[in-house]
Amino acid sequence: MREPDFLNHFLKKGYFKKHAKAVLALSGGLDSMFLFKVLSTYQKELEIELILAHVNHKQRIESDWEEKELRKLAAEAELPIYISNFSGEFSEARARNFRYDFFQEVMKKTGATALVTAHHADDQVETIFMRLIRGTRLRYLSGIKEKQVVGEIEIIRPFLHFQKKDFPSIFHFEDTSNQENHYFRNRIRNSYLPELEKENPRFRDAILGIGNEILDYDLAIAELSNNINVEDLQQLFSYSESTQRVLLQTYLNRFPDLNLTKAQFAEVQQILKSKSQYRHPIKNGYELIKEYQQFQICKISPQADEEEDELVLHYQNQVAYQGYLFSFGLPLEGESIQQIPVSRETSIHIRHRKTGDVLIQNGHRKKLRRLFIDLKIPMEKRNSALIIEQFGEIVSILGIATNNLSKKTKNDIMNTVLYIEKIDR
């Protein structure tokens, strides 16, 4: 194939339509060097500013010489290049994580929004086959994605539809360690696939076909389940066990960096079925929150170091506190103003719940803990609920319940009103 053929493919796919700056992960191998040649030649046509990034893994004698040559190449092309050296105990996983962390740093520094890698169809076959041998979940057998949004960046793999044999032989560095079978991927490439191709010469095409078919099913299920609120457990549990599992897996696709194992997935299923309330970290900075018939998975948000102190409000005063405006005896106007009868004889205390808190209702004392359970108040709402206290007794739990003391206060000569308005925090 000729270079213009690759350009036409890139333009047809619109890989760089949304991007002004792109970082190319440049290893020095044939695939990344040819991608460099295409992108640097057609920067104007693709309307991108190209930035190069290279990781020297320090695993071969030639590594430092290759780094120098790449610096020369960047200088000749008048392109910026960023280089980082891997250190520590080497493994495929550590090296991969190091590379992507470094690439993200470069993107943040340069304002680039696209990371371009030279993965091709042969890499795709190896990846799918590796995952199959490892016993990964079905959805991961769709392989590497052509385009993948991770946070605020997009990873683009424009060579994924091409095989390595489609690339012309140009100047590049040959990694001799690729011929050794020390690493799993090398054994796949050098031994397993060639043997299986003796049985089926089109084995690579078959693997790619399976990956594409799984991707089709995955996308179809996502589209068909678009109107199903999986986080509503009543809705989720109305389906068969098999459908529940598929819907839950589709829901988990929203969190590409979560990657639950089969055992962890089964544990999440069990929690959703058995626990009424649950909040706990699960993996990779995510937590599972369940509150009766609702659940969600979200990033763990940082907690404040210290709780806010109790607030004291005096008669004829106003104060904004935790998203509300409290006005003691001074009327507020509006349709959504809450009014609680109180006494003007003493100040009002506004706080969060404490151990042993009691509310009087219909002449009976009820512990807040029991009240919250009876009313099925979610744990998060229990912890954030504002309690209004006067004369050492709870007058109201804002938006949840009111003490019968307020009825007595209505007819008291010293009565007044606490006005409450929801405001932006």
UniProtKB/Swiss-Prot annotation:
One annotated GO molecular function: ATP binding
InterPro entries: Lysidine-tRNA-synth_C (IPR012796), Rossmann-like_a/b/a_fold (IPR014729), TilS/TtcA_N (IPR011063), tRNA_Ile_lys_synt (IPR012094), tRNA_Ile_lys_synt_N (IPR012795)
EC numbers: 6.3.4.19
Record carries keyword Ligase: yes
Keywords: ATP-binding, Cytoplasm, Ligase, Nucleotide-binding, tRNA processing
Pfam families, A to Z: ATP_bind_3, TilS_C
Location (main, coarse): cytoplasm
One GO process term, biological-process aspect: tRNA modification
Catalytic activity: cytidine(34) in tRNA(Ile2) + L-lysine + ATP = lysidine(34) in tRNA(Ile2) + AMP + diphosphate + H(+)
Binding site for ATP: 27-32
Subcellular compartments: Cytoplasm
Gene3D superfamilies linked to this entry: HUPs
Domain remark text: The N-terminal region contains the highly conserved SGGXDS motif, predicted to be a P-loop motif involved in ATP binding.
Family in the record: Belongs to the tRNA(Ile)-lysidine synthase family.
Function: Ligates lysine onto the cytidine present at position 34 of the AUA codon-specific tRNA(Ile) that contains the anticodon CAU, in an ATP-dependent manner. Cytidine is converted to lysidine, thus changing the amino acid specificity of the tRNA from methionine to isoleucine.
Protein name: tRNA(Ile)-lysidine synthase
Organism: Streptococcus pneumoniae (strain 70585)
Name of the gene encoding the protein in the UniProt record: tilS
